[in-house]
């Protein structure tokens, strides 16, 4: 298909924890859905191919740790679709140590957040068609949701602190 500029495979991870398995299944399902609607901005870098003519190398941030997402988004912005092929799979090994596993996840999340922030000029680009809403949705999921969760946590702590202070009778309190 000449409209496709980049294709990614679905990972089958060996050694993943139970909670990650559910996340990976959901992640792949979303990528496949985005591919059917238009394109996905995220692919697994371990197994992806793209047309070199569809990639603007000058637009890539070489120090970014989300290079696969950069490539996928760059190809789509330059007019070709990006899909995750449901029939293509590859084997990926999860880090054995929990600390290394967590470090990998945090680096990936930070890289995707930075990448999405750099792409904000495309959130409402009509030329991108259905891809612009996909980009906005991913930005909301990866940038706004964590901020809202932190805000909710702080509000909860503040509320309980106020309730706790309201219960103290300061008129009869003495320092000893």
Residue ranges and their predicted role:
Residues 27, 34, 44:
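Acidic-residue sensor for enzyme active/binding pockets
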Residues 33, 37, 137-138, 143-147:
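Loop-to-transmembrane-helix entry motif
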Residues 141-176:
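Membrane-embedded multi-pass helical conduit in multi-pass membrane proteins
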Residues 3-28, 62-138:
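Catalytic donor/gating beta->alpha subdomain of glycosyltransferases that bind UDP-sugars
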Residues 44-58:
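Conserved nucleotide-sugar donor-binding
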Residues 35, 52-54, 79:
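Short loop segments at secondary-structure junctions
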């Amino acid at each position: 298909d000449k409209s496709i500029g980049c294709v990614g495979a679905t990972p089958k991870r060996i050694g993943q924890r139970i909670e990650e398995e559910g996340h990976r299944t959901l992640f792949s399902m979303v990528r496949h859905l985005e591919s059917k609607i238009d394109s996905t901005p995220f692919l697994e870098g371990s197994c992806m191919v793209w047309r070199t003519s569809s990639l603007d190398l000058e637009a890539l941030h070489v120090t970014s740790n989300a290079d696969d997402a950069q490539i996928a988004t760059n190809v789509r912005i330059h007019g070709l679709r990006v899909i995750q092929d449901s029939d293509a799979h590859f084997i990926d090994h999860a880090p054995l140590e929990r600390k290394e596993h967590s470090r990998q996840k945090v680096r990936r999340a930070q890289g995707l957040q930075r990448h999405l922030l750099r792409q904000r000029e495309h959130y409402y680009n009509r030329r991108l068609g259905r891809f612009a809403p996909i980009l906005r949705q991913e930005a909301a999921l990866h940038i706004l949701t964590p901020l809202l969760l932190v805000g909710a946590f702080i509000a909860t702590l503040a509320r309980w602190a106020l309730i706790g202070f309201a219960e103290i009778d300061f008129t009869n309190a003495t320092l000893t």
